[in-house]
């Protein structure tokens, strides 16, 4: 059997997340259905993680095993021809037998995007959170500095985020290597998070809490204490899904 790895970009607007579900349109489900047509048998696609409904990706990775003789280029061309335009296969590679897209990953990079102008262009409304009023960037940068390093992120963890068979004794402890807020276009900013792993909705919960500080509703001290509490109820709201993008997975 061959072990094939896909590099995938997708627009998650019209999908119920990555993971295959009964009676729901998902990224994994769409790709597996096309792989079945190409190989004339059921194929299980294993992703590097699970994105929620409405979340986008520039660099999701996933692998599957197959005995088909199709080349990597053949797979890429065929899948892109068969898949909806919202899902693109950027690269196809044959990997070692023991490669696993999820368990071999050493880290991930997520971006959360904001549009800060008065009127958001229609083509950006599905991919950026509109923050029309000015926000305190200095206070938000201080919050970002607080989460860099190794911490218990229970306060920013939603229920069901951990696979109990794969915790490795870490629980809700994760290491954030980089966390910053920066401009990338006119009136366009993003939070950038790079870490060894992320809990369910962790990025969106962190962003939602930091925006509470940026909007003047809470203080930097409140954010720092929320992290220490290890209690989801101590932190702020979950930021909307459409601003979040999985940028890349590290190996």
From Swiss-Prot:
Name recorded for this polypeptide: tRNA pseudouridine synthase A 1
The record's section on SUPFAM superfamilies has:
Pseudouridine synthase
Provide the species name.
Desulfotalea psychrophila (strain LSv54 / DSM 12343)
**What are the binding positions for substrate in this chain?**
110
What general EC class does the enzyme of this chain belong to? isomerase
Tell me the protein family, please.
Belongs to the tRNA pseudouridine synthase TruA family.
Q: Quaternary form?
A: Homodimer.
Per UniProt, the keywords (alphabetical) are: Isomerase, tRNA processing
Q: Does the keyword tRNA processing apply?
A: yes
Tell me the GO BP annotations in alphabetical order.
tRNA pseudouridine synthesis
Q: What EC number(s) is this enzyme filed under? A: 5.4.99.12
Describe the reaction catalysed, as an equation.
uridine(38/39/40) in tRNA = pseudouridine(38/39/40) in tRNA
**Lineage, top ranks:** Bacteria, Pseudomonadati, Thermodesulfobacteriota, Desulfobulbia, Desulfobulbales
């Amino acid at each position: 059997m061959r072990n094939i790895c896909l590099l995938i970009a997708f627009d998650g607007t019209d999908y119920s997340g990555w993971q295959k579900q009964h009676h729901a349109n998902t990224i994994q489900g769409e790709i597996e259905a096309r792989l079945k047509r190409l190989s004339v048998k059921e194929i299980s696609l294993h992703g590097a993680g699970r994105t929620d409904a409405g979340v986008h990706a520039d660099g999701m990775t996933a692998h599957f095993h197959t005995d088909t003789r199709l080349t990597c280029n053949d797979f890429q061309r065929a899948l892109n021809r068969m898949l909806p335009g919202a899902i693109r296969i950027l690269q196809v590679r044959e990997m070692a037998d023991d490669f696993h897209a999820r368990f071999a990953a050493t880290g991930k990079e997520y971006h959360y995007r904001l549009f800060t102008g008065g009127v958001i262009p229609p083509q950006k409304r599905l991919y950026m959170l509109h923050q029309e009023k000015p926000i305190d960037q200095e206070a938000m940068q201080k919050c970002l500095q607080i989460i860099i390093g190794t911490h218990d992120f229970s306060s920013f963890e939603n229920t069901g985020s951990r696979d109990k068979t794969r915790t490795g004794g870490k629980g809700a402890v994760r290491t954030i290597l980089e966390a910053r807020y920066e401009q990338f276009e006119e009136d366009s900013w993003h939070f950038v998070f790079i870490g060894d792993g992320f809990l369910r909705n962790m990025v969106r919960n962190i962003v939602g809490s930091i925006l509470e500080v940026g909007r003047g509703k809470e203080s930097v001290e409140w954010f720092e204490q929320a992290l220490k509490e290890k209690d989801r109820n101590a932190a702020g709201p979950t930021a909307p899904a459409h601003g979040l993008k999985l940028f890349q997975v590290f190996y």
